[in-house]
Design a protein with these regions (language model features):
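Mid-domain beta-loop-alpha active-site segment that forms a flexible
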Residues: 1-3, 7, 49-50, 55, ...
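Short, charged, surface-exposed secondary-structure boundary motifs
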Residues: 1-3, 78-81, 95, 161-165
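Phosphate-binding beta-alpha-beta segment of Rossmann-like dinucleotide-binding domains, i.e.
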Residues: 1-42, 54-57
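Short, well-ordered coil/turn residues at beta-beta hairpins
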Residues: 7, 99-104, 128-129
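Short gly/ser/thr-rich secondary-structure transition/capping motifs
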Residues: 22-30, 78-85, 106-111, 133-134, ...
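Rossmann-like dinucleotide/phosphate-binding beta-alpha-beta segment
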Residues: 32-122
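Rossmann-like dinucleotide-binding domain for NAD(H)/NADP(H)
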Residues: 123, 131-226
């Protein structure tokens, strides 16, 4: 959740562009790096499960943002921080930041496509720290090129399997679409690392050990998925 908020702010504050200027020793305060105050922005959280709910809380309580949300199963724990909308379209249409937090299913592949991006408020920021298959990457790039979307932070990518977690510094990517994402200043791309903290890795290890002991003792585990 904290990673999502950080990346959203980095896009709003033109982080990549500022860093490029710094590397060039260009320290001018130009219109291209003028930003907005986060507290003045409306945020749409699509999917308010555990992570989405925390994102909503951080934006609402930490930054005093107006937060709207959509989830087919609204959470009572999240309601103090958001105004739930009846549809995704209604949630995104006036949002300055749209962040998505939902699992990948057979029903939501390319949910965020050309038609969906055209419903965004012009100049909105898009954040995907959920699943790459939710987003039509080419449609997103087109929306950014047209100025419909200001920029995006992507911790997931639809073709990441077999690429992310590997070192391609010698052999190259052979993926023009990912290359374009990486080289653009208005997009921040990271290799699915939002979860990658010391605390999270500890939890993964302990959960695996607990599940192993549970299977040995009972023949099954509450973490069983099949």
């Amino acid at each position: 959740a904290e990673f999502t908020v950080t990346q959203a702010i980095n896009i709003v504050r033109h982080f990549n562009h500022v860093q490029r200027k710094m590397r060039l020793h260009d320290f001018r305060w130009e219109a291209s790096i003028l930003s907005q105050s986060i507290k003045d922005l409306k945020v749409a959280v699509i999917g308010t499960g555990h992570i989405g709910g925390i994102v909503a809380q951080i934006f609402s309580e930490g930054y005093l943002c107006d937060v709207v949300a959509y989830d087919p199963f609204p959470s009572e724990h999240v309601k103090p921080y958001v105004t739930y909308k009846q549809s995704i379209n209604e949630a995104i249409k006036e949002a300055d930041i749209v962040t998505i937090h939902m699992p990948s299913t057979q029903y939501n592949n390319y949910l965020f496509n050309e038609n969906m991006f055209q419903m965004f408020k012009k100049g909105a920021v898009f954040v995907n720290c959920a699943r790459g298959s939710l987003v039509d990457t080419k449609a997103l790039l087109s929306a950014i090129e047209q100025g419909q979307i200001k920029g995006a932070a992507l911790d997931t990518y639809e073709y990441e399997i077999g690429v992310y977690t590997t070192d391609r510094s010698e052999e190259g990517l052979n993926d023009p679409l990912l290359e374009e994402l990486i080289t653009r200043e208005d997009i921040i791309v990271t290799p699915h690392i939002a979860f990658y903290t010391e605390e999270a890795i500890k939890h993964l290890i302990f959960d695996a050990l607990d599940a192993t002991m549970e299977v040995l003792n009972t023949g099954t585990t509450e973490l069983r998925v099949n």
